[in-house]
């Protein structure tokens, strides 16, 4: 059975992405959660991860003797291992688009990621209002995200019709927009609700809300 090493569900966006793929497609895996430490240098968390792999980060997937790190690499590995399942869209054109937007998510939207860290417990709406008014780059990044989502196959569907790796990659963006209550269009809100109602997303968020806060990871006062 595969083993997926993750960190706190309340904070770890990169852990969330492959976990959602594994869970949504009912793939056999064992979740191993290594909680973040309060120490600035990572403390026990960093030590435990370095003992597993030189990368020292989550997520980490172990499949027999194979170790795969980085969320995108893990998802590509899963798509190769389970080719009978539509982890990527079957249509070549849709698959190319899905891969492109995942790669863009993987390498872009730095302001959103730095200013609006994932936290599934508090309501940061008042912080979101301030950040939105102060940061033009943040507004531009959200506009680009909305543009991507507006190209989905159907307004009431997932990005490529059915839930896929692409949706898993943008789920932490959905939660950020919700936690910080950033202003978005009705079209975007419909996609957000579609994601937030997915059973795997519900399962992750439910578990995240039961976790104890890690002070070091709390970006803003609650």
Language-model-derived ranges and their functions:
Residues 4-6, 161, 178-179, 203-204:
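Short, contiguous strand/loop micro-motifs
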Residues 187-222:
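Long hydrophobic alpha-helical segments typical of transmembrane helices together
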Residues 1-130:
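GST-like domain detector, emphasizing the conserved glutathione-binding G-site
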Residues 105-197:
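GST-like fold's C-terminal all-alpha helical module
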Residues 56, 85, 155-156, 202:
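Secondary-structure boundary/capping positions in well-ordered alpha/beta enzyme cores
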Residues 81, 101, 180, 207-208:
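Residue-level signal for well-ordered alpha-helical positions
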């Amino acid at each position: 059975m595969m083993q997926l090493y993750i960190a706190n569900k309340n904070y770890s966006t990169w852990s969330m992405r492959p976990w959602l793929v594994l869970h949504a497609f009912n793939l056999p895996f064992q979740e191993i959660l290594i909680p973040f430490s309060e120490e600035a240098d990572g403390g026990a968390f960093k030590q435990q991860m370095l003992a597993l792999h030189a990368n020292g980060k989550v997520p980490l997937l172990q499949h027999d003797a194979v170790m795969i790190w980085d969320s995108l690499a893990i998802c590509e590995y899963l798509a190769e291992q389970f080719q009978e399942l539509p982890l990527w869209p079957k249509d070549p054109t849709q698959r190319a688009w899905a891969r492109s937007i995942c790669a863009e998510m993987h390498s872009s939207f730095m302001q959103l990621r730095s200013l609006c860290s994932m936290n599934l417990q508090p309501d940061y709406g008042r912080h979101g209002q301030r950040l939105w008014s102060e940061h033009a780059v943040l507004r531009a990044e959200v506009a680009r995200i909305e543009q991507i989502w507006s190209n989905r196959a159907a307004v009431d569907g997932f990005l490529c019709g059915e839930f896929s790796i692409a949706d898993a990659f943008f789920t932490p963006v959905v939660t950020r927009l919700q936690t910080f209550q950033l202003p978005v269009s009705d079209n975007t809100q419909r996609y957000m609700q579609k994601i937030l109602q997915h059973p795997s997303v519900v399962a992750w968020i439910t578990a995240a809300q039961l976790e104890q806060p890690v002070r070091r990871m709390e970006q803003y006062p609650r």
